[in-house]
Amino acid sequence: MHSENKLSNHGKQVTSGAQSQLPNVNQAQQQAPAGIQGSKGSVSGNHGVKANQISPGNPGLKSLNQTGGGGGMMKTKAKRERSVSIDTGDQRESLTPVLEPDAKVEGVMRSKRRCVLERKQPYSGDEWCSGAETEEEDEKPLSATHREHVMCPSQGHSGSSTTGHVSDPGGPGLGSGHGPGIRTDLHSRPPQQVVYVFTTSLANSAAEAVMHGHTDSILLYHQQNVPRTKLDQSTGVGKVSNLAEHISSSHSPPIGTPKSQSGTPRPASVGGVGHLPGTSTPSSTGHPDSEPAQTHRGGGTSSNNGRSAVHTLGLGNSGPQSVGVSGTEGVDRPGAIPHHGAGVSPSTSPSVLSALRQSELGQRVGPGNTDGLSKEQLEHRERSLQTLRDIERLLLRSGTGVAQEDPRGPNGNPNGTNVNNNNSNDGGRGLEDGEIGGGIPGNCHINNAGMPGMPPVGGMKKYEEPLQSIISQTQNLGGPGLDDSLMGPHHGMPPHSHHLSSPSGLDMGPLLGPEGVTPEQLAWRKLQEEYYQEKRRQHDMNPHQHPQHFRIMPEMGMPGGPPMLMRGPPPPYHSKPGDQQWGPGPMVGGGMGGNARMMDMNQEGPRGPRFLGQMRGPSGGGGYPESPGGVLGVEGLGPQRPPRPGMGWLEEIPPNMGGGGPFHGCCPPGGPGGPPQHFQGDLDRPMTREEIYRRIHRLDLQQMSRQQQQAGLGGPRMMDNPGGPGFPNPGMAGGPPSRGDPMDFPVSRTIMGSPIGGVGGDGGPTMRDIVDSPLGGNLNMNMGMNINQQQQLLAQKLRGGPGVLGEMLNAEDISRIRASQNGRGGANKAMIPGPEGPLQFPNQSSFPGGQVDGPYLQQPGPDMYGPDQPGPPHLSSTSRLSHIPMNTGSRVTDLGARHPPDLPISVNPMGSPAIPPSHQLKSPSLSQEPSPLMPSPSAAGLKSPSQLPQSGPTHPPLPAASGAGTPSSTSIKSPQVMGPSLGLRSPSGSPGHLKSPSMPVASPGWTASPKAAMPSPGGPPSVKVTGNGGSSSTDTGMSLPPRSSNSTPISQPSNSINPSMPFTSSPDAPPSQNPLSLIMSQMSKYAMPSSTPLYHDAIKTIATSDDEMLPDRPLQPGTNMSVGGMGNHQSAQMLLSSQGAMGPHSGPQSPMGMVLQGGPPLSHDHPGPMLPSPNPMGIPGMPSEIMGGGGGPPDGIGPCNVSPMHTQNQMGGFPRIQGPLHSPIGGMGQQFPPRPDDVLPPQQMHLLSKGMSHQRPPHQPDSFPPMPMGDGPDLSEVIRPTHRGIPEFDLSRIIPADKPSSTLQYFPKSETMSQPQQNPHQGQPPPQVSSAQLLKQLSSSGPPHSNIPSSNPHIANLQNMMAEQQLPLHPSHCGMRPGMGMPQIGSRGMGSGGGMGPMCHPGHMMGRTGMSPQQQLQQQHHHQQQQAMMANNLLQHPSHPPRGMLSPQQHPHNLIAQQNLMMMQAKQRGMALPGEHFGQQGALMSPQGPMMGPPHSQTGMMGPQSLRQRSMSLDSPLGYGPGSMANMPF
């Protein structure tokens, strides 16, 4: 390789002219201090080579080339050097001293010097850009120089790296160290094929030889000692070599050639020294062909250059490297240069862009030099870039990219090389050689990732390389990458250009550049983005999310800036999901609306080509991998990293980046992206960001409403979400990502989850599957995230714009996408079909029409719409959105997290809620329902709604999927998310599916709650994110954590909602339902993972609990019912919605979910009834199943899933519960009751177990009943109905339960109780009364328990509601019971589902869900929790003891959890995700409890409370198993 590289370098020698500047400087210095310099060179070369492998590879190559480039090269070099010298004389001189000192301090010194060098290099690079541009040759040399620069720095680092590259880190060492370290090790070692990859030993040998003066340069040493075979291995190198030779041959000609190369030289340089320079060399030409790939990655691979090329490409190997490396490296390293981000020297940007562009675009001509720009032009470019860089530095907080960048190097490098890669690329860091570690590491990372991942960077298929690299990145990104990406890219963001380069950056970066936006424009845009982002972020209070959020946003959005947003994020999302989703989506969806824009954007120029091409092509096609990989890689963050994560996101992603609420979703673009994208679609990119933020915010609301209205159908919106979403949902709205784990990708989860779930089915499941499944969690996540985002975007876009399109698109697209995704996610697939409508039969069944769109849509329409439709809900959503954004942001972040973990995604989902909330919010916002739904379930909810359709589709498929099992699971998970998420959606999907419509809405609504709750939990969920499962839906934690931030806002909203609690009441009911469902589902889900028996028991318990929840249910029903029962449920939904709207923050928040739930449940109910009982049972059950099943699998999928599941469940369940409760309160309620009552249903559910998690819960109650239900004194004992019908708690009774011991004691009792409860559920008015009493007690005890005051009001409401409900329910018994039961179930479901976390970690999930409220309600929650506990107790008889109540279910755990939860809650509130692990759960639980319990309880959240509690309960039961998890925290 080295030889080859040398050859390349040799050839490059000419290039070396430019190289010579740096390299020459090095060389000159090396020459001067030949020995030393040689050593230096050697070291440089050696290490450089290694580093080179990193990115420095190029520089190393160059260095080596120049130095080692060989004797002959030396001559040329000398010539070149002189030439370059002239050009670079000053640089060289500058460098020379540096070099010389470096030479002196050969190892580390050199490294340090190199740092300086690099710093100077920046100058050099810039100069070089100007100087080397003497000829294209120069340009090439530029490349070479860059390489050398990179190399030099790298070499220094490398040398140091090899030698003391870690120590070298002193300067460049850092980046280099990392880069080289990693690169050296990773790249150097693994990819010896590519750049002169010096094995450590080889490099060391070379270094020694050089040091000893045996050889002039490492390159020479290698040339002499390394078999050409190796060199040849690097085709790129060989080509480069040829090219180099060509160039060498034509030092001057390179000018001409460079001209050609100009178009390619950079790439050539970059790609392979000469590979790009098609003209220069055939090989160049070949490379150019591969360049895009090769250069991009292959190029990097192709030779050191390849690395550099990649770097160069990525980082702007040639120019950028020089510039970037030089400038950025130096600067970046220092961190001054904003990383070259924009800076990477123009080169980076250009180079990267160029490289990337060349890669992607096929070499848009090196950015600068490659452009064949004149020196002045190059200089100008450099200056512009520098300015941009400065701006970035200043503006982008990350501007300092270096810190980020370097860290990136270190972080990135370590992190996932890819990240660095991305980052490097992204951050331009790649460019930073010194940052070689940092910057180049990025590239290196890319290479590394590629190399390590695809060791043969060179070996890597040049063509595949980029893709793989990206994929690698994505994957790497997926995890760390995601985060890194998020973070790094976040950092990278600063470099936006790069950032673009970064995960998305790669694509994005180039895109940006290629975008045709001038650096200034870019900078401005960035600034704008930044500003808005910042604003948004602050606005969102997504501090947590910020980075990710920001990251994603930047990554997604920022990078593209607004355009990038579209372009960037969407593309990534696009790529990932899009490509899956967007692919079609964008492609198709591109037409979608926003998507189109996105697509367009993507398409647009570089991005288009790049993303689209890449993304589109690969993404679209293979896109998935590519998408995730490429785009994702790009996205990296993924949103799904990871989401992201991604995102993001998420993200997942992250992705919150969207910063703005919308963005937040995992996909900032998604959510925000969605809207933003949507907006973007609407707005132009530039505006997009800002507008997006602003608009998104406003729009979110507005759009939510508008969209909602626009969706008018809600359907569209929903559809959008659901439909479009269907696709979007799946993709965007579906948020397959969202729904999917990518939901996990936070957003993803729900969003992903939702979408994924829904479409998510498509993406969701896919995502989920992917993510969750493992489809690549990363990918998935990323995808999810992306998808999520995309989904969101799509959804939003669809929603916003294309509602129809969405629908249309959705169905088809979704289908397609789903298929695509599904392809990935079986569930998805099923879903897809479902989404199509069919699959979702459950949903469909409920809404056949709307399955996807139908149910989803329908749901959305009705439900989704309903709530959504209502402006308020919309608003709600929007509100939620707003906070959700926070959440979302968080979520997105979570997304990022989520992606990575389902959890995050999950979290995201719930968190998603956060993210989804973000997404949900975002999307939901966008979607409105989505917002609410989405938001609510957002992840799940929104998504749910979105998901619903997806969910519906998914859900139904879920069932199928459920059947589908994993997919199902995933699907379910997704669906689950779908379910729960979907649940919401699920309702749509699940119940509706069941509630589907409603639910979705409800979900959203409820989700809102969850969402809000989530958001709140978001925060906690965010924490939850950790919670993961909990997260999922609620999760949210992932998102939440950031969400937490968001949460805060969300929390507020939550709190608001809390206040809204009354609404909550209503919502509560729905939540109840939902919760029940959720919980059930969750339970199923949860249990599933746990032990089935446990699960069953848990579910049963939950079911029982649900029964206990009757009050809640009644409450719910009452409220909901009041609202209109089932029909109401739309009404209610509306109500809820209103509430949701009203309380998106308020009502919705706590109620958020509740309210929304209520509404949604209404919706759900709507469907529920529609779904009707049977469905409810079936659907609800199904949803349950879905939820449950989904949950189960999701659970399996993990807590994450749970989250989504939970979300779904929550959403679904909750809504379900609510729906049923609501709907039938008679219907559903009955249903539920029947279910619960029926236990059969529960059993059935049980059967459905998975599917019927919901039922199962009831069933479980059967099974488990004793546990919670039997909590200590009978509910009746504990709770005495008052004349008012408000249950009073016998605190003496309850409190004991509070104690873990008591709880434990009660645990058995609980069982007893449970049964009674169930009976009550079935026909135990007393217990119901008990419930009432409980409620009362709750009230009563609530205060005692906790700050009932806070709680109290709600509780009072709750009580009233409860009383009402109770009465109604009571009378309804069926209803009430169901209410209770359902609520219970809901509780459980919610708790479980809602808690999803519960399922997952009911606690966290729920917490997620609940958390939000919890957080919001946190205090309340505390009391509420306690109350909830009480309520739960009430609700859940098991909860008799307040905590005991929970406890019973969770019994000790629950109790403890609850207590802990409370504690946690507080913490969580703090966002601690307490329970962190399950703190989340705990938190979740807490939230669950509180949210569920108290908030719900209080508010009527009883349902939710129940849910929450149930969640807790669920947790408890699940806690035992999963419950343990749940309990775990405790």
UniProtKB/Swiss-Prot annotation:
InterPro entries, per database record: Bcl-9/Bcl-9l (IPR015668), BCL9_beta-catenin-bd_dom (IPR024670), Znf_RING/FYVE/PHD (IPR013083)
The keyword Iron appears for this protein: no
Low complexity bias locations: 19-34, 156-165, 409-426, 485-503, 960-971, 979-994, 1031-1060
Any one Gene Ontology BP term: canonical Wnt signaling pathway
UniProt-recorded Gene Ontology molecular function terms: beta-catenin binding; transcription coactivator activity
Ranges annotated as biased composition (Pro residues): 1258-1268
Disruption phenotype: Severe defects of trunk and tail development.
Basic and acidic residues biased stretches: 81-93
Stretches for region Disordered: 1-101, 155-187, 246-353, 398-439, 473-503, 821-1076, 1250-1279, 1310-1331
Xref: Gene3D superfamilies: Zinc/RING finger domain, C3HC4 (zinc finger)
Key words, A-Z: Activator, Developmental protein, Nucleus, Transcription, Transcription regulation
Subcellular localization, as worded in the UniProt entry: Nucleus
Biased composition (Gly residues): 170-180
Compositionally biased residues, Polar residues: 8-18, 247-264, 278-287, 875-891, 920-930, 944-953
Cellular-component GO terms for this entry: beta-catenin-TCF complex
Main localisation: nucleus
Role according to the record: Transcriptional regulator that may act as an activator. Plays a role for mesoderm patterning in early embryogenesis.
Entry similarity comment: Belongs to the BCL9 family.
Protein name per its UniProtKB record: B-cell CLL/lymphoma 9-like protein
Organism: Danio rerio (Zebrafish)
Gene name for this UniProt entry: bcl9l
